[in-house]
Amino acid sequence: MKNPIVTFEMEDGTSFRAELYPEIAPNTVANFVRLVESKFYDGLIFHRVIPGFMIQGGDPTGSGMGGPGWHIRGEFRLNGFDNPLKHARGVLSMARSMQKDSAGSQFFVMHADAAHLDGQYAAFGKVIEGMDAVDKVASAKTGAQDRPVEEQRIL
């Protein structure tokens, strides 16, 4: 079976494509694909942007506190799950609270390598095309709580 490929088209006309790895994080990928196919992410923003680190989106409230109404098991080493994918530039990973099994819909794309996240968060895919779109989001001017002043919206 081929790995799923997802495309994020941005309001500014740029886009990026990511390959997802179900052999590394099967439940995480199944959840993410379900959200993409249901158009959950359409119209949402990247609400947290830290250049040289990551861009984060997937919150329907745009506040950093929202989700889909459910949580999934965290597929990462700290939670007893072997996930060898490193948090390198372009890698997709699930955001969560301090609770290990609290991921739902919020995800982040690594703008740079961040080895300190390895084993702490469920990495599950990698940008294979359009890192320039990720770079553009990461370069957006931000205000309080690393929120872009100009919304970085997914179509």
For the regions a language model picked out, list residue spans one by one.
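Cyclophilin-like peptidyl-prolyl cis-trans isomerases
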Residues: 1-155
